């Protein structure tokens, strides 16, 4: 099916929001201009809505295989489509881990059969993510690994991390890291700060993250490797990354919507839906994340979509697993709490969720360019809705944002020229 989207707005190559039509033919973007006419195309009048590149998320957890009670590739990618995401990168903390040919081939087969959006799987750095034996990077790259990570756990052995970075550099691949120094975690369930002290909980100190990042940055410099830091959460981490970039080290970084919108002061009680890793930090950390995003220290926004069951989250804040869902709330949360409040511009938000992650990892995505795959998201910037977890397409309903009123909701997502998800009657 060919589509002609009429009367929309988009961000042009100069970074300005302007009026446009957009023609999709044979699964690709055929033309982006005003006043397009075309035969043999279904005309969809978007009536002033934003026509954005499909959103790109480099940090997601789809749980399959092994964790299908939390999420499946089918439910997770449908939730991604509802959130406007057309390309997502799936972390390897599944069971089994994609750490060898057999496991990666099985994962790719599942993706091919079930995914509603483009899914790029990470390959594990170490076998079973155990930190002691390196995987066969060459084979995993051949089978389509997006990059290498042991996300969920930090690689504790510096010699292992250095060897991994050297091998990845030879393959022109990135090493991506969840950064925690295990000897400093302190069996924590929240940030070590006012909230942990008030509730008598073990806290995870900020330095647990920043010291690990500092170590890895020096290793990346020695290996001449692209090193990407997951979900930055502390002021110290931002400072270390900023200094590394100024020194010319190949380091990039991401931040989550929840760390941009919340800090520990916003946690109302010992509610497990506010438990994520890294935890919500202090006000100074939150301010540093915003500053880092604006000055280019932090390159992109990624959701760290981490679904869990209601039963798992009901165990209490100390025993419940870390993580919140992110796909279906990301854009409206960021638009309402950052753009509408003047913290960043709409143009910047689009870039942080599209071209910045795509360019960082060399993906042909994130821009509405003629000839590229038609991965597109239509967003109604005026529509206001209350976040209701019962309506999530993800199996995971674990969110701290239930009841929040937000504007800027995706209403249609197109992947490869096909409608992957559409809000009922949204464009009529």
Swiss-Prot record:
The active site is at residue 304. GO terms for molecular function: allantoinase activity; dihydroorotase activity; zinc ion binding. GO terms for biological process: 'de novo' UMP biosynthetic process; purine nucleobase catabolic process. Zn(2+) 1 binds at residues 59, 61, 151, 304. Zn(2+) 2 binds at residues 151, 178, 231. Gene3D superfamilies: Metal-dependent hydrolases, Urease, subunit C, domain 1. Substrate binds at residues 61-63, 93, 277, 308, 322-323. Keywords: Hydrolase, Metal-binding, Pyrimidine biosynthesis, Zinc. PROSITE patterns: DIHYDROOROTASE_1 (PS00482), DIHYDROOROTASE_2 (PS00483). GO terms for cellular component: cytoplasm. It catalyses: (S)-dihydroorotate + H2O = N-carbamoyl-L-aspartate + H(+). The keyword Cell membrane does not apply. Pathway: Pyrimidine metabolism; UMP biosynthesis via de novo pathway; (S)-dihydroorotate from bicarbonate: step 3/3. InterPro entries: Amidohydro-rel, DHOase, DHOase/Allantoinase_Hydrolase, Dihydroorotase_CS, Metal-dep_hydrolase_composite, Metal_Hydrolase. Its EC number is 3.5.2.3. Binds 2 Zn(2+) ions per subunit. Catalyzes the reversible cyclization of carbamoyl aspartate to dihydroorotate. Belongs to the metallo-dependent hydrolases superfamily. DHOase family. Class I DHOase subfamily. PANTHER family: ALLANTOINASE. This is Dihydroorotase.
């Amino acid at each position: 099916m060919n589509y002609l989207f009429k009367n929309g707005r988009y961000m042009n190559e100069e970074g300005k929001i302007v009026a446009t039509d957009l023609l999709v033919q044979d699964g690709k973007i055929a033309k982006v201009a005003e006043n397009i006419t075309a035969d043999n195309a279904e005309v969809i009048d978007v009536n002033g809505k934003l026509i954005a590149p499909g959103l790109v998320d480099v940090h997601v957890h789809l749980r399959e295989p092994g964790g299908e009670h939390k999420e499946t590739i089918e439910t997770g990618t449908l939730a991604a489509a509802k959130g406007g995401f057309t390309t997502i990168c799936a972390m390897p903390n599944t069971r089994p881990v994609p750490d060898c040919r057999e496991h990666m081939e099985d994962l790719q087969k599942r993706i091919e059969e079930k995914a509603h959006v483009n899914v790029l799987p990470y390959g594990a750095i170490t076998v079973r993510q155990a930190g002691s034996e390196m995987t066969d990077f060459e084979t995993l790259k051949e089978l389509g690994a997006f990059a290498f990570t042991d996300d969920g756990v930090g690689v504790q052995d510096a010699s292992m991390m250095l060897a991994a970075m050297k091998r990845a550099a030879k393959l022109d691949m990135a090493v991506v890291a969840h950064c925690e120094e295990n000897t400093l975690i302190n069996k924590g369930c929240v940030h070590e700060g006012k909230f942990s002290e008030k509730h008598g909980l073990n806290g995870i100190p900020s330095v647990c993250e920043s010291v690990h990042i500092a170590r890895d940055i020096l290793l990346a410099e020695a290996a001449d490797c692209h090193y990407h830091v997951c979900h930055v959460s502390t002021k110290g981490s931002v400072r270390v990354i900023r200094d590394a970039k100024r020194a010319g080290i190949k380091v990039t970084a991401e931040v989550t919507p929840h760390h941009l919108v919340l800090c520990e002061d916003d946690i109302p009680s010992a509610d497990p839906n506010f438990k994520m890793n890294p935890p919500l930090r202090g006000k100074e950390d939150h301010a540093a994340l915003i500053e880092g995003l604006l000055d280019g220290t932090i390159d992109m926004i990624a959701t760290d979509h981490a679904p869990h069951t209601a039963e798992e989250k009901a165990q209490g804040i100390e025993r419940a697993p870390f993580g919140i869902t992110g796909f279906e709330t990301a854009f409206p949360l960021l638009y309402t709490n950052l753009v509408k409040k003047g913290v960043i511009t709409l143009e910047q938000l689009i870039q942080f969720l599209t071209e910045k992650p795509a360019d960082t990892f060399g993906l042909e995505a994130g821009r509405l360019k003629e000839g590229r795959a038609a991965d597109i998201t239509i967003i109604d910037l005026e529509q206001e809705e209350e976040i209701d977890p019962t309506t999530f397409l993800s199996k995971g309903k674990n969110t701290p944002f239930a009841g929040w009123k937000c504007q800027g909701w995706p209403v249609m997502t197109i992947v490869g020229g096909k409608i992957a998800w559409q809000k009922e009657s949204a464009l009529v």
